[in-house]
UniProtKB/Swiss-Prot annotation:
Protein's UniProt name: Alpha-glucan water dikinase, chloroplastic
Keywords carried by this UniProt record: ATP-binding, Carbohydrate metabolism, Chloroplast, Kinase, Magnesium, Metal-binding, Nucleotide-binding, Plastid, Transferase, Transit peptide
Record organism: Solanum tuberosum
Primary location recorded for the protein, binned into one broad class: plastid
Underlying gene: R1
Tissue expression profile of the protein: Expressed in leaves.
Assembly and interaction partners: Homodimer.
Organismal lineage: Eukaryota, Viridiplantae, Streptophyta, Embryophyta, Tracheophyta
Entry's family note: Belongs to the PEP-utilizing enzyme family.
Length: 1464
């Protein structure tokens, strides 16, 4: 029952003997005037009211229009003063204030009403209440609550009274039959006081009449409807099976109670189905009775009404209304004299009866809930190690030994000076045929050569249109030629001159007439004709193909040799689908050998085919069974590859989605046979049907599925040709395409009315036959193939029997039946759950060999696709949904994506994160929105990473092959984008965009994160990546809007502000540089604001940061100039470096660290030793001091390296910055002097550190390489340009190396003891990541956990953001060599972070599962760790007496500090 409608009727029951004339729903939220209401208070209404569902039997008495009042249609907050209630209690509340409570027991249904009225009370009263269930003492909080009700501390409900004159009134509706009583207090907000019942709660008992007979029988269909209505009222919750059963029995009990109170089964049926004839007034007699119109006719008429209305998704109550309206329409027809038999013949012709039965089955009121199985999503993880694309390419670029003809072609091309327009090599018998076309001085030169041993004659002609045979002019015939009817014949001659090493037969033809476009030919060997796989050879004279090769580039990043093979065979493939599928099958072995890029090439080719970018049929007739057999062969090979090469499963699924299933001969043959039967049975043997029949016989294709659907839609629309063309055009078939078929379709359909039923039936069956061949991933077809079906033969038409796939899980078929029945539901949540459950059940079968594996794969692909379309259809359902529902949808779509892709570990951990966020929200955790925002950010990163993978893998192949094949450029430009859009990733991205602003608002995050709060004025410049402009010098003050900022970049000269949607850490290198350089830096989370800023490119903006926002406005040149002058006045003096000298030692211990020997990093860590609290650990350190690099370089063993570096340094000084990379590479060639090895070993062992050489010479070599990498980082681009920017002499920069033992960290952190974003020195700001700190300070995507902590309350850290970094770095016990330059000591220059710190061993990248991380899941653990980090920072700040920038790690709960420096 509709609550709003039901309560409007309830309002009418509270009035005196008046009723509103109009019957429409009343929705204004105002409360009616009191004149009507007061009359009700004084005396009980004489009006007899009998409530029956949504209708009310009343005696109408009209009132003047001006006295009508609009009452609120809110479901619960209703005015109540009916004194006719069964139970009434009065309470004195002091003074002249009284409370009256009336309880109205259920008269029908299961709703009790409790009315409250306070007389002479305050204006602001609230009912503070809860329900007490039978056998319980604690309050429960019913789901049915009046408007304005709020939950108070999860313990009570608080509902405002409605003021009416001097009274305050309120009604509660109680549907839960388990509730025995209502307990409450009244809160007087105006006087801030509680009104109690003698110091305790008020308690009002509900009245429940006893059932007269315990075994009252209720028809099951009525119990089902009542159960459904209860479930709907309670918010369509996802009940477990035991709760579902309990609810079903509760519905039965409600109906039994109703019968016990005197209601008949007929009354109940009428109430539930809204057909109570007693609900009509005497003024409106009801003519239609249920007995007049049989149910099946009413259902058929309702179906017709529903179809005409556009098949809307009616709620159950509307469906019943429609059924009764249909019954009423038919009754009117009967009254006009039409008989029931005539009605039946008119309505149930054609397929209407079958459709009605199917529709009614799908729309039944049965409670169809699903309890999904509990699963650990970790089982979804697919991790495969496939060869990197670069390595595969290197293998592919190692060409096999050239054949004789290819070697000849290479040498011949080098001899030809003229531009080569076309080059083709054809396979012929046991050899090859080369054709080269060149252009010279207006003449076309054709050179042919073959390595066949027997004498060969060329049988040839010329063409003015492709494929045409015209006899060549006699003037151009080579010696020995003869002229025939439409051709010439010329013998090949042995090639014995030209200095070519390969001896072949060759022939040259020179064509002077520029009107010819190509040359068709065949070869003649004795009496044998040699053709191009059954067709004529043809070579074009156009330069287009050569230009295409140039546009295609060199094929880098592709399986080039395979793509070239595909391009060479395309002329053959375009003859028919049989040819294309057989060629593809022949190439699967080559693709397997080429690996990931090979299958990418096949996917690109098949995708071009599926999107009609390639010709489907050209001058060739083929039987449908031959096409289906070729498909069958190809899909068998793809199925086998799916089993044997699991690392390529994602690409193989995508290939299969572009190819129909195919099948044994009978399946394809039925396409040919069945169309004949359709024509014969329905008398439609000419016109369009005959033309389509010819096309089907000679070259059926996926277009035929669309044509069949267009015919069905045309017939259903009562033969509207507009509908026919609409279906065709929406699916890419135009009139021109119909005419382009070898067997063209010229005519439009033209059927008679009496053909309608039979054609709908037969074409519906035919559609299944077409889809069985062409639409392997069609849902209905895929389900039928897995569950099995049988189609009987008829006359010459063969029968088809498909057996069910064995080993399907228990209950799996029920899931599929549900999916088919509900696939078009508008409310998609339950459908999505069933689809995902079906995919989860199917997954284990896909991971093991099965002779019907491809049927299971096509089913899985179809289920995957259906999830996407269902989600897109369900967007409307989410328009007003709460964030929890959007998060649930996100989790379903993410699960679907994880089921479809490889290397999905990050996606699976995102999925676990969403489930945790939902759990936090449902559990009342205040941090749920903050945590969900981090999961959302990580999910976006995962999607971006997946999109980048697709682009890297597929786009080069698409561009190379597409350029050669002449595919439209627009199709190439969006190739990867369209691949992504075809999957769940696009739907997921859309859902994330819906949720993001909601989470930001809930978590009070705003639209900005201010990283460097500096006011700035400048010209707006928009760039894709900060990295691409980091070395630029902007002459004018510039505000950069950069789409991508990773965190490691430099901010270019002249930039005064940097705005990005990216999320670098607040403590990343670029963030620190921005604050030090007084550059405004902020992340903008609002896409609308970002778009507005981008649209202002070229204009001058003033940016004014606040703690949580940036206010921007356009300004003029004068304001810009005044701002620039101010900046220039504040520019600091030039910085200077002092060159350090070698101090005589290759290695020193921590107690020898001085400013002449090492940088601030080493000195600070030595200073902390013994001074910090015992709870803070300091790692043992030694160092290679300043000057050691220069000393090593000057050693005799490194003379060659020194000379090479000298040359490169000169090159660099002349402005050739490419020398930087060469210098770094050359530094790595240094050899270690024996004395260095000796001293370093002694110092490390003397300090208690392990000596790498003890594990073998190889380990020392690893350590030595790490040391050299630190030295070489002096010449990394970022550092070099940074020193130039502040005019530091780069030659004076010296590099010491701090050597520390690595602590295998659980977490790493960076602390700024003054909040860098706000400048607040009373609070500490810190960021924490899993594993080593490189993910925090380096260019690793995502955000760290961030928090602040007041120094006066170090026990109360406040989390600002949860982590979204997908990767953590972990390492075994090892040694790290840290850069320690003299550039880090300069005040006003942030030299820290510019140079590399290199561990001896490589870190392991681990995808992080935050759902099992105690820092996230355990609040007490988090509070302890964060407090300890803050304490360590505070202690070090106090030790130095100034703000500090501190790095450290956490291991087994203990804090270690690895370095500190003054905070810039």
């Amino acid at each position: 029952m509709s609550n709003s409608l039901g309560n409007n009727l309830l309002y009418q029951g509270f009035l005196t003997s008046t009723v509103l004339e109009h019957k429409s729903r009343i929705s204004p939220p105002c409360v009616g005037g009191n004149s009507l209401f007061q009359q009700q208070v004084i005396s009980k209404s004489p009006l007899s009211t009998e409530f029956r569902g949504n209708r009310l039997k009343v005696q109408k008495k009209k009132i003047p229009m001006e006295k009508k009042r609009a009452f609120s249609s809110s479901p619960h907050a209703v005015l109540t003063t009916d004194t006719s209630s069964e139970l009434a209690e009065k309470f004195s509340l002091g003074g002249n204030i009284e409370l009256q409570v009336d309880v109205r027991p259920p008269t029908s249904g299961d709703v009790s009403f409790v009315d409250f009225q306070v007389t002479n009370g305050s204006d602001k009263l609230f009912l503070h209440w809860g329900a007490v269930k039978f056998g319980k003492e604690t309050w429960s909080l019913p789901n049915d609550r009046p408007d304005g009700t709020k939950v108070y501390k999860n313990k009570a409900l608080r509902t405002p009274f409605v003021k009416s004159g001097s009274n305050s009134i309120l009604r509660l509706e109680i549907r839960d039959t388990a509730i025995e009583a209502i307990e409450f207090l009244i809160y007087d907000e105006a006087h801030d006081k509680w009104i109690k019942n003698n110091g305790g709660n008020f308690r009002v008992k509900l009245s429940r009449k006893e059932i007269r007979g315990p075994d009252v029988s209720v028809p099951e269909e009525l119990v089902q409807i009542q159960s459904y209505l209860r479930w709907e009222r309670k918010g369509k919750q996802n009940y477990p099976p035991e709760k579902e059963k309990e609810e079903y029995e509760a519905a039965r009990t409600v109906l039994q109670e109703e019968i016990a109170r005197g209601a008949s089964i007929q009354d109940i049926r009428a109430r539930l189905t809204k057909t109570n004839d007693k609900s009509q007034s005497k003024e409106e007699p009801l003519h239609v009775t249920k007995s007049d119109i049989p149910d099946d006719l009413a259902q058929a008429q309702a179906y017709i009404r529903w179809e005409k209305a556009g098949k809307p998704n009616y709620p159950p109550e509307k469906q019943i209304e429609e059924l009764e309206e249909a019954r009423r329409e038919l009754q009117l027809e009967l009254e006009k004299g039409i008989t029931l038999d005539e009605l039946r013949k008119t309505i149930t012709k054609g397929e209407i009866k079958t459709k009605v039965e199917k529709h009614l089955k799908r729309s039944s009121f049965a409670v169809e809930r699903i309890q999904r199985k509990k699963r650990d999503f970790g089982h979804l993880i697919n991790k495969y190690t496939s060869s990197p694309a670069v390595q595969v390419q290197k293998v592919l670029e190692e060409p096999p030994a050239l054949s004789k003809i290819k070697l000849y072609a290479k040498e011949k091309e080098e001899q030809i000076d003229d531009p080569i327009l076309n080059k083709k090599i054809f396979k012929v018998d046991d050899g090859e045929l080369l054709v080269l076309v060149a252009k010279s001085s207006g003449k076309t030169k054709v050179h042919l050569a073959t390595d066949l041993n027997q004498p060969i004659t060329l049988h040839w002609a010329l063409s003015k249109s492709p494929g045409e045979w015209m006899v060549p002019p006699s003037s151009i015939l080579p010696p020995g030629s003869i002229i025939l009817d439409k051709a010439a014949e010329t013998p090949f001659s042995a090639s014995s001159s030209d200095g070519l090493t390969s001896k072949v037969q060759s022939l040259d033809i020179v064509i002077e007439d520029g009107n010819f476009v190509g040359m068709p030919f065949v070869l003649l060997s004795g009496e044998k004709w040699i053709k191009n796989q059954g067709s004529d050879f043809y070579v074009g004279f156009s330069a287009a193909s050569k230009l295409a090769l140039k546009a295609a580039g060199d094929g880098s990043g592709t399986a080039k040799s395979l793509l070239d093979k595909i391009a060479d065979m395309e002329s053959e493939a375009q003859k028919s689908f049989m040819h294309r599928f057989n060629i593809a099958a022949d190439l699967i072995e080559d693709a397997t050998s080429a690996g990931e890029l090979g299958f990418a090439g096949i996917l690109v080719w098949m995708r071009f085919m599926a999107t009609r970018q390639l010709i489907w049929n050209k001058n060739y007739n083929v039987k449908p069974r031959e096409i289906s057999k070729a498909q069958d062969r190809l899909t068998d090979l793809l199925q086998n590859a799916f089993t044997s090469h699991p690392q390529y499963r994602e690409i193989l699924r995508m290939i299969m989605s572009t190819v129909g299933r195919g099948g044994e001969g009978d399946v394809g043959q039925r396409i040919r046979d069945e169309i004949l039967v359709i024509q014969r049975n329905n008398d439609c043997k000419g016109g369009m049907m005959q033309e389509w029949h010819q096309k089907l016989h000679n070259n059926t294709s996926p277009d035929d599925v669309v044509i069949c659907q267009a015919l069905i839609d045309y017939i259903k629309s009562d033969f509207d040709l507009g509908v026919y063309w609409k279906t065709l055009n929406e699916n890419g078939i135009t009139k021109e395409r119909l005419l382009s078929y070898d067997r063209a379709i010229h005519s439009e359909p033209n059927f008679r009315g009496d053909q309608k039923g039979g054609l709908l039936r037969d074409l519906g069956h035919y559609m299944r036959t077409l889809k069985a061949v062409h639409s392997g991933a069609d849902l209905e077809s895929a389900i039928a193939n897995c569950m099995g079906y049988k189609t009987e033969g008829e006359g010459f038409m063969v029968g088809v029997q498909i057996n069910p796939v064995s080993g399907l899980p228990s209950g799996f078929q029920d899931l599929l039946h549900f999916v088919l029945d509900h696939v078009e539901d508008k409310n998609v949540e339950t459908l999505l759950e069933r689809l995902l459950e079906a995919r989860e059940e199917l997954r284990p079968l896909l991971l093991k060999p099965n002779n019907r594996l491809k049927d299971l794969l096509f089913l899985d692909i179809a289920l995957d696709s259906t999830v996407r379309t269902a989600v897109e259809r369900g967007y409307e359902e989410l328009n007003n949904a709460n964030p929890e529902k959007i998060m649930y949808f996100i989790s379903l779509v993410l699960e679907n994506l994880a089921l479809s892709v490889d290397d999905n570990e990050d996606l699976v951990y995102c999925l676990k994160g969403w489930n945790q966020a939902l759990s936090m929200s449902n559990g009342g955790d205040n941090h749920w929105a903050l945590f969900a925002k981090a999961v959302l950010d990580r999910t976006r990163l995962a999607l971006a990473s997946k999109a980048e993978w697709y682009h890297h893998l597929l786009q080069p192949s698409a561009e190379y092959l597409g350029s050669i094949l002449g595919v439209d450029q627009w199709a190439l430009n969006i190739f990867t984008e369209e691949i992504i859009r075809a999957g769940s990733a696009a739907s997921l991205s859309s859902l994330l965009n819906r949720l993001d602003p909601v989470l930001r608002k809930t978590a009070n995050l705003g639209s900005w994160q201010i990283i460097s709060p500096v006011e700035a004025v400048g010209y707006v410049v928009v760039v894709d990546e900060l990295l691409s402009v980091q070395n630029e010098i902007y002459e004018k003050p510039t505000i950069l809007v950069a789409k991508s900022v990773k965190g490691e970049e430099e901010i270019p000269d002249g930039a005064v502000a940097l705005i990005t949607p990216d999320m670098p850490d607040v403590l990343s290198h670029v963030s620190v540089r921005a604050r030090n350089g007084k550059v405004c830096f902020a992340t903008c989370f609002d896409p609308n604001i970002l778009a507005d800023l981008q649209a202002k490119e070229g204009r001058i903006l003033l940016l004014k940061p606040t703690p949580s926002d940036i206010i921007y406005s356009e300004v003029n040149e004068i304001e810009l100039q005044s701002s620039s002058n101010l900046v220039e006045a504040e520019t600091s003096a030039t910085l200077r470096l002092v060159k350090k000298q070698f101090g005589g030692c290759y290695a020193i211990s921590a107690d020898e660290f001085t400013s002449e020997m090492v940088g601030a990093k080493s000195r600070n860590i030595a200073y902390l030793k013994g001074k910090v609290p015992s709870s803070v650990g300091i790692p043992t350190s030694v160092a290679l001091p300043f000057g050691v690099f220069e000393k090593v370089l000057s050693d005799d063993i490194n003379q060659g390296v020194a000379k090479e570096l000298q040359i490169l340094m000169k090159k660099l000084s002349e402005g050739d910055f490419s020398a930087l990379g060469e210098i770094r590479t050359t530094v790595l060639d240094l050899s270690a002097p024996a004395q260095l090895v000796k001293e370093l070993k002694e110092k490390m062992q003397g300090s208690g550190m392990p000596w790498p050489g003890d594990e073998g010479p190889k380990r020392w070599e690893q350590a030595w390489m790490a040391i050299k990498k630190v030295w070489a980082s002096k010449w990394n681009e970022r550092a070099y340009f940074s020193t130039r920017k502040v005019k530091l002499d780069h030659d004076y920069l010296c590099m010491a190396v701090l050597v520390q033992e690595i602590i295998n960290a659980d977490y790493a952190f960076v602390i700024h003891t003054t909040n860098p974003s706000s400048g607040d020195d009373s609070e500490i700001y810190a960021e924490v990541v899993r594993g080593l700190g490189e993910t925090l300070v380096g260019a690793y995507p995502g955000r760290a956990l961030s928090f602040i902590c007041k120094k006066k309350d170090l026990n109360s850290p406040q989390v600002l953001g949860y982590p979204s970094k997908p990767i953590g770095l972990f390492i075994k016990r090892s040694i790290i060599f840290r850069s320690d330059s003299n550039g880090e000591d300069l005040e006003g220059y942030a030299g820290a972070g510019l140079y590399d710190s290199v561990p001896m061993d490589e870190e392991e990248k681990v995808v992080i599962d935050y759902s099992s991380d105690p820092l996230i899941t355990d609040g007490n653990f988090r509070q302890t760790i964060l407090s300890n980090i803050a304490r360590a920072g505070h202690a070090i700040e106090e030790l130095y007496g100034s703000p500090q920038d501190i790095e450290g790690v956490v291991r087994d709960g203990k804090i270690y500090v690895v370095q500190t420096r003054p905070q810039m």
